[in-house]
Amino acid sequence: MKSRVRKSKYTVHRKITSTPFDGFPKIVKIIVTDPCATDSSSDEENDNKSVAPRVKRYVDEIRFCDEDDEPKPARKAKKKSPAAAAENGGDLVKSVVKYRGVRQRPWGKFAAEIRDPSSRTRLWLGTFATAEEAAIGYDRAAIRIKGHNAQTNFLTPPPSPTTEVLPETPVIDLETVSGCDSARESQISLCSPTSVLRFSHNDETEYRTEPTEEQNPFFLPDLFRSGDYFWDSEITPDPLFLDEFHQSLLPNINNNNTVCDKDTNLSDSFPLGVIGDFSSWDVDEFFQDHLLDK
């Protein structure tokens, strides 16, 4: 008869614990074997099925070592400050501040370039020793191309220009017109007496010249005719003074028969005795106000 060989599954669980110790290093192991170990509680329910038995072995290992031999936890690397990075030449490339339109070359120089929106191309501005010089070169090019809309690093763009609305100056057309045209314009009547807008009807209005009837002129009578006497007129003067001296005192000047010589003295023919002496005349009586005397 052949003997049946029973197979079993053997597993080892090891746990290591390290503790500090002043003396020599020592190791303590605790081993436990479980021949009837099961993976889960469901294995006990399936009794009808033939399942290979499991054997588990638990090993606990305790190590006693010195404090110097104890492994230290890994420390986190601290980031260097920009000041410390500036002291070290190797870290200078990594701590450079980035500016708009500036790039650093592998050999350490700084290049500046800008994009031209009109041509849609990049303009090369040159290579500079420092990043600040390259940034200033970019700012100048941006202000020259974009004006007040430029985005700069250091330089301040110019202010936007203010749009001033200038008042429109009226256009005055001066035309020289003849006397006939000005007379015609004066005859044009306005539609409204209060209207301030003048307009011309030269294209639509026809001018007609109509004869005007002249009124009968009024002729004044010839008061001073070349007649027999100098004062002869249709209006009879007041006979108080003129009739008395007309015929007797005044000579007939306009008479053709009378010839006056240069040596003729008219004062001889004019009797002054009729008037009297001038010193005897009371002139003040003529200028007195009779109303005040009353």
From Swiss-Prot:
GO function term, MF aspect, one = transcription cis-regulatory region binding
GO CC annotations on file:
cytoplasm; nucleus
Q: Where is this region: Disordered?
A: 35-54, 64-87
**Where is this protein found?**
Cytoplasm; Nucleus
Ranges of the DNA-binding region feature? 98-155
Upregulation details from the record are: By cytokinins.
GO BP: cotyledon development; cytokinin-activated signaling pathway; ethylene-activated signaling pathway; leaf development
What is the protein's known function?
Component of the cytokinin signaling pathway involved in cotyledons, leaves, and embryos development. Probably acts as a transcriptional activator. Binds to the GCC-box pathogenesis-related promoter element. May be involved in the regulation of gene expression by stress factors and by components of stress signal transduction pathways.
PANTHER family (alphabetical): ETHYLENE-RESPONSIVE TRANSCRIPTION FACTOR CRF5-RELATED, SHN SHINE , DNA BINDING / TRANSCRIPTION FACTOR
Q: Can you name this protein? A: Ethylene-responsive transcription factor CRF5
Species per Swiss-Prot/TrEMBL record: Arabidopsis thaliana
